[in-house]
From Swiss-Prot:
One of its GO terms (molecular function) is catalytic activity. It comes from Acanthamoeba polyphaga mimivirus (APMV). This is Uncharacterized protein R197. InterPro entries: Cytidine_deaminase-like. The lineage of its organism: Viruses, Varidnaviria, Bamfordvirae, Nucleocytoviricota, Megaviricetes.
Length: 187
């Protein structure tokens, strides 16, 4: 066997096993509906993958981002009003019995949803599942004014400065270090 071909095959096998791992554990679905109730795009079949060309770090593509990417609208067309439904199934779910997990949009997704009006799509309501198995409905302006949900990616890494400014939040790493210093002073 050629030594160069071996390394290429090994890399391909690693990528396949990595994609199987991601697809097995990230069952995240997103549906866009327009104001007439017609389903515009569904991103349940698209495989989650690592999106490498992001400027701040490696992060997986979320279902909301995939749904927005699939809708390619011209700026010259009339703005479409739509609602967004995002659900996430727990890994232990089966077709016979499923249970919903928290799928509230993260900072990056909210930023993209808010700025989707630039591409001719105005999302008014966001429906998402929570850990109790219920689907919650929020108007976009209300969800933007609340305390923001940090996905696992943001909890373990540094929040990009543009999101900190846009949403007015503190980085979790900064707040954790200041809390630990306060507790040391009390001891």
């Amino acid at each position: 066997m050629n030594h160069q071909n071996y390394h290429v095959k090994k890399q391909v096998n690693q990528e396949k096993s990595h994609s199987n791992y991601i697809n097995r554990y990230n069952r995240h679905n997103c549906i866009n509906k327009d104001n007439c109730g017609n389903t515009c795009r569904i991103s349940s079949k698209r495989k989650s993958k690592i999106h490498k060309p992001i400027h701040y770090a490696y992060k997986s593509i979320h279902a909301e981002e995939t749904a927005l990417d699939k809708i390619k609208l011209q700026r010259s067309k009339k703005t479409i009003k739509a609602s967004l439904l995002v659900i996430r199934l727990k890994p232990a779910s089966t077709p016979e019995s499923y249970s919903l997990a928290n799928s509230r949009p993260c900072l990056a997704c909210l930023y993209r949803i808010k700025n989707s009006a630039n591409n001719g799509l105005r999302i008014n309501k966001i429906y998402y599942s929570n850990d109790d198995g219920k689907i919650i409905c929020y108007k976009l302006k209300d969800i933007l004014s609340e305390k923001q949900h940090l996905s696992k990616f943001y909890r373990i890494s540094v929040v990009p400065k543009e999101y900190v400014r846009y949403f007015g939040i503190n980085s979790p790493n900064v707040s954790d270090s200041s809390d630990s210093e306060d507790s040391r002073d009390e001891d």
